């Protein structure tokens, strides 16, 4: 999921994907 794109970048997740 690319939901982190607007939330920022949590630990273990990429801001690009």
Curated annotation (Swiss-Prot):
Signal peptide stretch: none
Chain ranges passing through the membrane: none
GO cellular component: extracellular region
Gene Ontology MF annotations: toxin activity
Keywords: Bradykinin receptor impairing toxin, G-protein coupled receptor impairing toxin, Glycoprotein, Hypotensive agent, Secreted, Toxin, Vasoactive, Vasodilator
Top-level lineage group: Eukaryota
Keyword ATP-binding tagged: no
Subcellular location: Secreted
Principal subcellular localisation of the protein: secreted
Glycosylation sites per record: 3-4
Tissue: Expressed by the venom gland.
Function: Induces smooth muscle contraction. May target bradykinin receptors (BDKRB). May cause hypotension.
Family, as annotated: Belongs to the bradykinin-related peptide family.
Protein's recorded name: Vespulakinin-1
Organism: Vespula maculifrons
